[in-house]
Amino acid sequence: MVAGRFRIDGREAQSKRGSPVYSGYIYNDGGGGVANVRLLIETLDAEGKVIGEAQGTALGSMLGRDRRYFEVPLQAAGASYRVRVLSWDTFATGQ
């Protein structure tokens, strides 16, 4: 998934307890510092219809060209997923 300054490389997985999660890395392809990136994960059925939503946060800060791991619990597994960045905090990097 590419959303301008962010790129997401994620997939469905299972938590240690066996529950479905969507996990991966979010990349800050922009030039400034960002922190606490909020994500919306939409669970889709085989026809592309949204059958569930979950929100999570990639906690911590990232400089430009950095990445951060995230893991968002899902209500149920789906055929595919759509991921969107909802919001983020910015900070000065002194560059």
How does the language model describe each region?
Residues 1-19:
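Transition segment at domain starts
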Residues 26-31:
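Asparagine-centered strand-capping/turn motif at beta-strand->loop junctions
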Residues 55, 71-95:
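Terminal connector regions
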Residues 38-42:
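Beta-strand signatures of extracellular beta-sandwich domains
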Residues 59-66:
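Short proline/glycine- and polar residue-rich coil/turn motifs
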